[in-house]
């Protein structure tokens, strides 16, 4: 067998074994206050978050059903394949490079007969916590099943499109958490901390997740409101609560980046300065949320955000930004929409915005946020939803990628569509980019997004893998028209 045939044969073996993501995305890790790629270059990420849930996906991939079963996995995966294709379509101006995945609890909730054994939590009014903050119906065998058949396949799809992935646990934190719940033998195996330990043990132990820990990161929890220890919240309570989870994840073999949340819906990180979490890998950042009206920013009709005041308040609440990388995993804004709204319980007219959690303007809150982002230089971000970055319905109908709320300059869609491209291109000389070589190409193979070789590619998205004369393999995503 001559050298060329030998190289091609070796390439075929390697292509069948190698994951698409590892070849396309340099591994990331924490270096001081920054994210660094495998080439020692500073990186910040920008993209969207989303959740595999019919309701939150506006019934686009399936109509209402009473439950979620194996039969529902494929239409869900097919839908997100389109989302990932759209938000990474550079030819149409889309430049996302990170996706925050919510392992939605709708897939892992059992019936009464499958009660998880986890305890109920209660609101200040004495009512039992409901919805995503209620873990009493969590069923571990379902989580194990859909981790393999849905959540990890979604991660693989995202990686294949050049998206780093931040993974969040199912649901949201109950309103009042305490360290004592875990330290008390009567509640240890029933409390929310034990729930997180189980979730992340299954996730961090998975061989695929471990293999791609440079591209996949973990956000420990979503929006803790209150965490206390011995009745206090500023005595190391956050550290005592999350330290066991970090320690367990590392013991299970996951060495990738862990994003630690703060309290007050991910606004308060002050106590971590005095009581930092210890990480054996020194690969720790902080996951923050930022909405209009927070951190002394403006909102509503009074969005007179002062950039410097916003910046100072943000840094006061998130002082860990001086020492560690930050990812803002939820942010959005849009102004009031003329003529839209509803009447409240008292019959007063309440104006509505264009469909975001926060009401504000780009010229106020948005520009203030960009000022913080650019000044600190170590903040990544994901918009609160895919549909806040681009118009999903237009894309599904016409394959056209355009900003969400097109034409509304004061909404986050137009602004972030522009900024993500700006940030990506600026970073392309110092951050994420495909490592190229001028070595001669021995052979080129085309693979579809599912990883199957295509002999005669037509129009669409493909991963090309090229065997070089120096024995190396390089790969990249291409759009064929």
What do the PLM-derived regions correspond to, one by one?
Residues 27-28, 52, 56-76, 179-217, ...:
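Extracellular glycoside hydrolase catalytic/binding regions
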Residues 2-3, 7-9, 14, 19-95, ...:
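Non-catalytic accessory regions flanking glycosidase/transglycosidase catalytic cores in CAZymes
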Residues 28, 68-98, 103, 107-217, ...:
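An active-site-proximal structural segment forming one wall of the substrate-binding cleft
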Residues 37, 44-46, 352, 456, ...:
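Short capping micro-motif at the N-terminus of alpha-helices
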């Amino acid at each position: 067998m001559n050298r060329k045939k030998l190289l091609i044969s070796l390439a075929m073996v390697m292509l069948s074994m190698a994951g698409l993501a590892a070849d396309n995305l340099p591994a990331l890790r924490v270096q001081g206050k920054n994210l660094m790629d495998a080439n020692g270059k500073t990186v910040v990420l920008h993209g969207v978050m989303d959740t595999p849930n019919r309701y939150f996906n506006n019934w686009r991939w399936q109509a209402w059903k009473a439950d979620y079963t194996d039969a529902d996995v494929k239409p869900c995966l097919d839908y997100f394949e389109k989302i990932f294709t759209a938000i990474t379509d550079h030819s149409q101006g889309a430049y996302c490079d990170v996706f925050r995945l919510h392992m939605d609890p709708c897939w892992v909730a059992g019936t009464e007969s499958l009660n998880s054994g986890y305890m109920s939590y209660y609101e200040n009014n004495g009512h039992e916590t409901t919805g995503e903050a209620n873990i009493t119906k969590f069923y571990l065998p379902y989580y194990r099943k859909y981790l393999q058949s849905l959540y990890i396949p979604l991660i693989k799809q995202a990686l294949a499109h050049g998206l780093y992935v931040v993974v969040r646990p199912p649901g949201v934190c109950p309103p009042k958490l305490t360290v004592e719940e875990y330290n008390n033998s009567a509640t240890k195996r029933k409390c929310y901390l034990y729930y997180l330990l189980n979730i992340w043990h299954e996730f961090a132990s998975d061989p695929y997740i471990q293999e791609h820990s440079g591209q996949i990161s973990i956000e420990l929890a979503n929006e803790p409101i209150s965490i206390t220890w011995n009745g206090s919240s500023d005595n190391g309570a956050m550290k005592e609560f999350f330290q066991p989870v970090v320690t367990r994840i590392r013991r299970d073999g996951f060495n990738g980046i862990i994003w630690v949340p703060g309290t007050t819906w991910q606004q308060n990180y002050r106590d971590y300065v005095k009581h930092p979490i210890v990480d054996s890998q020194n690969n720790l950042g902080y996951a923050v949320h930022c909405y209009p009206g927070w951190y002394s920013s403006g909102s509503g009709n009074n969005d007179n955000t002062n950039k410097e005041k916003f910046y100072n308040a943000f840094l006061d609440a998130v002082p860990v930004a001086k020492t560690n990388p930050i990812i803002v995993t939820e942010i959005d804004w849009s102004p009031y929409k003329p003529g839209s709204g509803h009447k409240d319980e008292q019959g007063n007219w309440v104006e509505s915005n264009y469909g975001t959690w926060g009401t504000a303007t780009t010229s106020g809150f948005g520009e203030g946020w960009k000022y913080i982002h650019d000044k600190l230089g170590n903040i990544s971000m994901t918009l609160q939803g895919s549909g806040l970055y681009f118009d999903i319905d237009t894309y599904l109908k016409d394959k056209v990628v355009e900003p969400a709320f097109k034409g509304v300059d004061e909404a986050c869609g137009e602004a972030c569509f522009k900024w993500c491209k700006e940030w990506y291109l600026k970073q392309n000389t110092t951050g994420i980019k495909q490592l190229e070589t001028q070595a001669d190409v021995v052979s080129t193979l085309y693979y579809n997004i599912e990883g199957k070789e295509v002999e005669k590619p037509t129009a669409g998205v493909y991963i090309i893998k090229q065997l070089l004369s120096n024995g190396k393999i390089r790969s990249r995503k291409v759009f064929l028209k």
